[in-house]
Amino acid sequence: MQEVAARYPGKVTFVSENFGGSKLADQFGVKGYPAVFVDGVLVASPREFGYFGEVEGAGRYAPWRNAASQAKFKDDLSRMIDLILAGRKDVVTREHPADAAAPRELAALPALTLTDLSGRPIARDDLAGRVVLVEFWATWCPPCRSTLEWLGTLKSKYGDKLAILALAVESPEPTVRSMAAALDPTVRWAIADAATAQSFGDITAVPTMFVFDPSGKTARVVYGAPPDLHEQVTPLLDSLVR
């Protein structure tokens, strides 16, 4: 985005806002990230991004780490800026209605067809009756490591009443295995495929945490690694784990 803004010296200023601290995001009901606004218009919502692009319903710029996806985003963003600078903000607003930004709400733990790193299948039925915490992460994500270390302490605290699934995206298997062995073997580690990520509404940022109550209903979704993560999640788990 900074690269695109730099094409318009003196006309476009790039501003980065932290997730959870954006008035524009609150105004549009944006609950995840990334999201891109141009002159007050939401031109790319979180649902347009994602780490997988080969499944039905994938966003326009998924898979995001693909060079072609990033090139398309830059072209589209340049076009939006050009229209606004030409006095055609109405076109941009018409092409990006506010209701299109509605987040995908995940009501309950989806069906799972995964195999963990030890070769054991992970199935939703096997998790029934327990609180389930699902963490999507990546080996190249610095905040993910500290969050994963914390998950190990949660497993020690709650034992078998809490199932923790650490699902890696966009990460080489040897590195995933190495990190899993170094961090906590009691957490169930697996590599998420496209279908799994899509069943969670696609994953547009890491880390992303889902907490499900013993009945399987979604209790909390946490995007990123906010400074109050422990304060958000620990009391919730205390109330759910019985």
Feature map (PLM): residue ranges:
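Conserved segment of the thioredoxin-like fold in thiol-based oxidoreductases
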Residues: 1-20, 25-35, 39, 154-195, ...
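Thiol/disulfide oxidoreductase modules built on the thioredoxin-like
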Residues: 25-33, 41-72, 181-186, 192-238
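Short, ordered coil/turn segments that flank beta-strands lining enzyme active or ligand-binding pockets
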Residues: 38, 117, 214
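C-terminal partner/receptor-binding element of secreted or periplasmic proteins
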Residues: 64-97
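N-terminal "domain-start" segment that seeds a small globular fold
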Residues: 90-124
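Short pre-active-site segment immediately N-terminal to redox-active cysteine/selenocysteine motifs
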Residues: 130-132, 137-140, 205
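Conserved hydrophobic packing residues within short motifs/helices of P-loop NTPase cores
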Residues: 134, 165-167, 210
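Conserved redox-active cysteine motifs that mediate thiol-disulfide chemistry
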Residues: 136-153
